[in-house]
Amino acid sequence: GGGIIKSNNTLYEEEIGSITGMVLELGPDCYADKKRFPSGPFCKKGDWILMRSYSGTRFKVHGKEFRLINDDSVEAVVEDPRGIAKL
């Protein structure tokens, strides 16, 4: 039988590849490109989303991490982030 062998580095990168976050605010130009987002906004304020771990600009305010990400960095909207498991 055939198969794919992945290096430890590849496995590690896949493991840390996605994280969840809550949408705190949407900027005025978010999802404004009708060609890329013909159905309108993909997510809304208060949604839990899945994004790549390297997405956006990371910063801390009073010890809490925040990120500024582009609208096209949202991979999915998830109901409950506690149910998300990394493979």
Predicted segments with their positions:
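Compact, glycine-rich, soluble single-domain proteins
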Residues: 1-87
